[in-house]
Amino acid sequence: MDAAGLAEQITELLQLCRLLWIAIEHRDGWAAFAHWIVILLHCRARKEFFVAEPIPFRCNFMTRKVYLAGPEVFLPNAREILDRKAALAREAGLLPLSPGDLEIPHTNSKRERAAAINAVDEKMMIQADAIIANLTPFRGIAADTGTAFELGFMCASGKPVFAYTNVARDHSGRVSDLYGGAVAYDAEGRLRDPNGIAVEDFGLADNLMLHAGIERRGGVLIIGDAARDALYTDLAAFKTCLAVAVEKLR
């Protein structure tokens, strides 16, 4: 074993000792201790998952990790917006985990790269304690499909879920706008589009599986109303959602 390897093992041993002490000193600390042991072992095997944000031994032991989901990764200034959101999360006392933060392993094809990105993002969601999802309509009248998947992933994982949107008009209203207002109620009181296809009409921000799924789990979906040219850069609704998440995660 070379000097670098020995130093790494000594560092890990010291980290484990510190975690053990904290587990003894804090009520309910053993579950968290076991959680960090798993992450530490995972880090040894797959260090690329911790390139941008190492395991947070420097942070408060009980710091909550929040996965920041949203379509911002596609923006031309993605790094700027993601960094702003991450900074706000840190200021609020949370540890942000965000797609685009971490190094993607080298691959030999586009299909393999897609799978690698999916794997990295799912690993971060597994490590996260909660999610804040940006459900602002993206390339259409509904939330980004990748963000919807991530929200469902966290719901299925039994973790706290929070979300926001920068569009105040509800889902059925946006469907109506899509068809130039040509939606109408049928004889049974069901709202339908010009093709006779039913339209969800619950006054929700998006598909009921998203909005109702969040609220059923005790989360919130903050409704913002940003200017059209700032739909993905206005962080007012995000800040409100972040404040609620911090309070509920205490």
Where are these regions (language model features)?
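Short linear/disordered segments characteristic of secreted peptide precursors
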Residues: 8, 26-31, 44-46
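Conserved catalytic or regulatory cores that recognize and/or transform ribose-phosphate-containing ligands
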Residues: 56-250
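Aromatic (phenylalanine/tyrosine) cluster motif
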Residues: 33, 49-50, 57, 61
